[in-house]
Amino acid sequence: MKFRSDSSGGDEPRAPAAGDGGGGGDEPAKRQRTDPSSSSSQGEASSSSQPPPQQQQEEQPPEDAGEGEQPRVPDLGEDLVFEVLRRAEARTLAAAACVSRGWRQLAEDERLWEAACVREWANLGFSERQLRAVVLSLGGFRRLHAVYIRPLQWRGAGVPRQQGRRQPPVRLGRDQVQLSLSLFSIGFFQNMPCPKKDKGNDSDKNGGGQCG
């Protein structure tokens, strides 16, 4: 018997080998299927590494954070403050000295206290230059007002000492001013220290009498 040749068209076609070039057509399709998943995973990783825009806005400091602060008092300058305090009374000068260290140094100026004292005095009959020289040599106008003038104003107003701040300052007459100046000078000389004595005798170096 004769067998038919294998070249007949009835046989089934063989499957291409794995290493043949025919299988290369499926690889791009597989890559296209896998590329979207890999790109989506990369996008998720990049999106997770970057903070959302809302968190960035919250982390930034607000621009209007300083609106809640109290407005600062503008610096008027020492010259302008001095001219204002020069027209103030003694009570205002004492209150201004409690504002700050700079105002305290400014309020302790003897020219301000001189203006406050002379404004409340009557005409004494002698120049302000002579008065200034005497008072400054005895301790200053601020001490003169605190120790002698203010008690006279309280007594002249006829009110107790605790309520003296509620009353306006009383203008002193000529006799009261002279009395306060006399007491001021007496108090100054009473508080002067005794002169040093020699070791050999009890008399002082200038040949004066004994002290105490």
From Swiss-Prot:
One of its GO terms (biological process) is protein ubiquitination. Residues 1-74 are annotated as: Disordered. Widely expressed. Preferentially expressed in unopened flowers, shoot apices and elongation stem. Expressed at lower level in the leaf blades, leaf sheaths, roots and rachis. Residues 70-116 form the F-box domain. Keywords: Gibberellin signaling pathway, Nucleus, Ubl conjugation pathway. Essential component of some SCF-type E3 ligase complex that positively regulates the gibberellin signaling pathway. Upon gibberellin treatment, the complex mediates the ubiquitination and subsequent degradation of DELLA protein SLR1, a repressor of the gibberellin pathway, leading to activate the pathway. This is F-box protein GID2. It comes from Oryza sativa subsp. japonica (Rice). The lineage of its organism: Eukaryota, Viridiplantae, Streptophyta, Embryophyta, Tracheophyta.
